[in-house]
Amino acid sequence: MFPALTQYVNIKEFMRRIVVKVGSNVLTREDGHLNVTRMSALVDQLAWLRKHDYEVILVSSGAVMAGRGELQVDHQLDSVEQRQLFSSVGQGKLIRLYYDLFREYNIKVGQVLTMKENFLAKEQYQNQKACMNIMLENGVIPIVNENDTVCLTELMFTDNDELSGLIAQMMNADALVLLSNVDGVYNGDPNEPHTRIIPSVYYDRDVSEYVSDDKSSHGRGGMISKLKTAQEVANAGIKVIIANGNTPNILIDLKEHPMETLHTEFVARPKEK
């Protein structure tokens, strides 16, 4: 039996605390530079959610690509050196762009750079959680990214999908929205004419057989990574949505017109009362 629902679950009542993860393939142009127009459109939507009384946490990739666009390196660097150099320059550019874009809505943002170790040690975990809670309580949108400049390769997150899932669980979010360059999880090869988006998947169903391991051209993640994160987070009682960040007003449409908006929803395990 096909391991998914055949129609969308009604998510008209959108959630109060939302973690939105946006990948490099959404934020980056074909030439490898940041797509400021798309970043602006994303900020417009996040500001709209804030206006409608939703708490927003943004997990944003793009620092490495932003740094690569700023530097002309005339000698060979290994992958670790590239990541450290480009992210050290690019993270500042990325957060400044977000700061300027959100300022048009009089919304304050704060930068949170984290590492996997911060989720493994209890004291660091609680400190990080407290920091982000105080930001939200004071109307500040946390913008989270991995601290690539100091992370050891063996202790890095798989990608920002994994990071966003950990953030959603730590912050007890109502929903995690993973924005990529695809409309959701397909029930086959997306290039085949009869392939369709799987609209809804229960937290305990396996759809990995339908997913290829194509990685983002500008990031470390792929659909298998998103699927793993989505199922883990949904199993923890948090709704997960995979949608296309290149679609105009995708976040607003998920709130206002969920039944008509292409996406895959991972239905959360009911939380114990």
Where is each model-derived feature located?
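C-terminal catalytic "cap/lid" subdomain
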Residues: 2-76, 80-273
